Amino acid sequence: MEIKEYEEKYAKGMSEIIRDNLYTINIKDYGKEVIDKIARHFTEEEIQKNFPERVKCFVALKDEKVIGTASLDLIKDMYGIKIEDNKDKYIILTVFIKKENQHQGVGTKLIEKIEKYACEIGAKELIIPASIYGCEFYKKMGYDYYNGIKELNKDGEYVLSKKMIKEM
């Protein structure tokens, strides 16, 4: 397995993985109506249009096929509150692993890659809106509930964070 930066040619594979996870795993916690709204943002075309604007997006590849994805973006607002002049808080988005490759370290490698890159660009804190299904994974990766509060936000996600320590 290797981790590479996003290229347009990976959009189709990313879309398939994300939408498959949404409709087979996340649907159990959120229902079809919510998943339908979310899934619209993850067609191949939407990924090609929106993902290049993110600070960084990585894909995990096995035999040149996408088996996972994760991306990083600067936080511009936090649930409707504009964050002006933010230069050091970033948000981890769209972490999805192909079902048959879950629990094999792919997600861990992607998060480690995101964290390393975040440190390199001066991030002081990473925020992640985690699905109910993914919450325990991020806890194992050293993330804790934002401001110590374990509650679902308006989107049905737990918000977790991790302070970054720049490695020497």
What do these predicted regions represent?
Residues T94-I97, H103-K116:
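Conserved acetyl-CoA-binding loop-helix of GNAT-fold acetyltransferases
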Residues K124-C135, M141, E151-M168:
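C-terminal "cap" of GNAT-fold acetyltransferases
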Residues R19-E46:
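Conserved GNAT-fold acetyl-CoA-binding loop/helix
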Residues E2-E16:
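A short beta-loop-alpha structural element at the N-terminal edge
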Residues T43-V59, I91:
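A short helix-loop-beta-strand connector motif used in the catalytic cores of GNAT acetyltransferases and
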Residues V59, K65-L74, G80, I91-F96:
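Conserved beta-strand in the GNAT
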